[in-house]
Every structure is written in structure tokens, then in C-alpha cells.
Amino acid sequence: MVKSFRMKALIAGAAVAAAVSAGAVSDVPAAKVLQPTAAYAAETVFSQNNGASGFLPGRYDVQAMAPAMFNWSRESRFAGNTDGTLKWQNDIRTTPQNGAGAVIDGDGTVYLHSRDGEMKAFNPDGSVKWVTGNLGKTYTQSPVLGTNGVIYLASYDKKIYFIDKETGEILTTVPLSGGPSSETVIGSDGTLYFSTLDNYVHAIKPTSKSTWTERWKLKTNGVVSSVPVLAKNGTVYVGTYNYVFYAINSGTGQVKWSRTTSNAFKGYPVIDKDGNIYAGNQDGQLYAYTSTGSLKWTFPLNGFSSSSPAIDHNGNIYIGSGSGELFSISKNGDMNWSFYTDGPVRTAPLIDAKGTVYFGSDDMKVYAADANGNELWSYQTDSNVVSSPQLAEDGTLYIGSYTKLMAFGK
């Protein structure tokens, strides 16, 4: 059954009509119809700002198809080619934080961290290229691919691993004061930013494939609940479980400003080309802040949000909700459409070059919706779909559930 913005539009329209006939002023948002667009001219190499975003370009492997899960717009330069046909699946247990999932290098190798404490590298046909074990169990984090052929992975055994991308060899480890509460992100000079469960945000700089130095660490008011992101102006943004959102100078570790809300920010924020920050909160709202910390607007998500948003080249923001909805919201805070599922949407959506939006739900389905929120296809899995999707150059979609890594394509 197609569950799209159409039902939302009918309900909203009926509510508005009833309010008008009664002489009342209605604040029910109307769903907008977005005109389908052809695939736009995307970057030929990976760009964190392959949309209308304002991230600080880091030393990621730009020849990779998708070197990071977070700290970018999540608008892919590739077009998906799948109608929901499953190419292959591989048993792998994941318990991701913040919608963590796989990354893809330039030759199509897919890297994923498992709940069993293994980093696995899969060939594009689903065969296993290599496995590196004993990396820490429990929650799984997304690896990131650096420019030097090194994979960086934050692990719950209180370490950051430097792993050779080609062989899986552990090159070195960075001991941590607490288990990581976020993925690692890479700055413009190669500095790694991450947070730990003892309330610190850290900045360390690799000096080779196997050496590093600490730049700074900042004690926050509580465990960091969101993945750090870096804006073009050099600001690191994070939220905590103690309901505070921080803007931090990435060079010094000094707090620039902070704002208190009624609950915790989860996932990671996105940043638009003007420096505005958009972050979902457990209080059920999407917050929009300016780069100086002024609140622009909030948007009600009808349920808690642990989903990370994505932003497209028109400035539209896409985010999931505990209500089971995926929302498309304009940069002005107006609803374009919402798409209904039968379970919380915790994954970060992915937008392809044609405007198709891919995401997963706790109703154990993978979904694809067009630019107007109409369902294109869905696929029933055997467990909650909790890791966020990625696209390869050939249009293959990779996404994980609690039990499997799945590849969809033709």
C-alpha cells in the first residue's frame, strides 16, 4: 500500500476547510507538490557539499564513492538504479548508534563494523574481501575513509583504530578515556573529531598512518548524544544528553556558544550553505539555528527524533520521526510532505541524483520515495532497518538491518 504525502495533504486540506468554515484561523501546514527534476550536475568526486550544504571539507578519500556516513549533505552524486530487487545479502549483526552503517571506497569495496567486534570488507558481489576481529563489541559505529588509505573506527573497547584499507591490518590504536559516543569525523587538516562517554569532545591529529598527537579535549555538561559536524567557518557542533547544544572552535576547543533545549539532540546536525544548522531533538522537534546561535524556527515531528537529517540542493531537509514518518521540510520551516511507515524512522535518509529518497524503518522495511513523497518501492526484511543507506556508482543501494547487510540493484 502506498503511504505518501497524499493522505497527509487530504487530512490537512480537510482540517483547513473545516477551520475556515468555522471562522477559525488554522495553523495546519499544507503539503506542497514539488516539481520533479532531472538529475542535476553533481560533483565527479565525493563532496561533502554535493547539495546546498555548508560543511568544512575534510581529508576524506574523495575518490571513494561514499567515504563517510555523516558530516556531509547525504545527497549522493549517483543515481540509484534499483526497483527494490535484492542483489545479495550477507549475515552481519549490527547495533548501530545514530543510524551508523557502511562506507564505500573507489573500487566499490563496502566496509561495515559488526556487533561481533569485526570490521568486514565486502566486494561488490557480496563476497568477503577481509575480516579484522577483536575491535570491540556492543554498539557499532560507522568507519571513515581518509586520504591516506587508512580507515578510522571508534570502538566500544575505548580505542580509535587505524586500519589499512586494503588488507585490514591494524596499524595503531588510540587509547580513549571512555567508550566513544559518536563516530569520527575528519577536519580540513586531517584532525579527527569524536566524543566519549565520559563527557569529552576530542580532537586528535594523525601525523602518519600509525602515529598521532592530541590537539585538545573539551569537557561538556553530559555525554555527547550527537555526532560532531564541522561547518565551513571552523565550528564543531555537538549536542548532549543533558539537553545542551554546543558550538565549539575546532582549532582551540573553546566553546563559542551553547543553547539549552527540553531534551537531547540525537544523530548529527546538517548545515546549509548559509551556515544555518538543522538538528532533530528527542523532544519531537527539528531545530533551525543560525551560525551565531539564534533560533530561526522549529518544526514539529509528531514524535521523538533520533534520525539524522539530509539536505538537498534546493535546501529541503529530510528527517525521520518516532511517529513513523519521514518529513520533507523547506529551508523556511514549512512542510513539503510526509511519508508514513509502521515504525519509528531512525535512519538518516539518502537522496540520489534524481531526487529519490531512500531510508529504513523499524517496521522492518526499506523504502524509496520520489521527490513528492510517493512510494516507489519497499522491501520487507526480517528485522528492524536501523543503519543508514549508501549508494555506489553503479546505482547499487547498500543498507543494513540488525541482522544483514543488503545490496539492492539491477
From Swiss-Prot:
**Pfam families under this entry?**
PQQ_2
Q: Name one GO cellular component term.
A: extracellular region
Q: Per the record, what phenotype accompanies loss of this gene's function?
A: No PcrA-related phenotype.
Alphabetical UniProt keywords: Secreted, Signal
Q: Which domain of life is it from?
A: Bacteria
Q: Is tRNA-binding set as a keyword in this record?
A: no
Q: InterPro entries from the xrefs?
A: PQQ_b-propeller_rpt, PQQ_rpt_dom, Quinoprotein_ADH-like_sf, WD40/YVTN_repeat-like_dom_sf
Q: Where in the cell is it found?
A: Secreted
UniProt signal peptide: 1-41
Record's function text:
Increases the processivity of the PcrA helicase, but does not bind to DNA.
**UniProt subunit comment:** Interacts with PcrA, Pdp, YclM, YkvL, YhcQ and YomL. The interaction with PcrA is not essential for cell viability or repair of UV-induced lesions.
What name does this protein carry? Answer: Uncharacterized protein YxaL
Gene name tied to this protein: yxaL
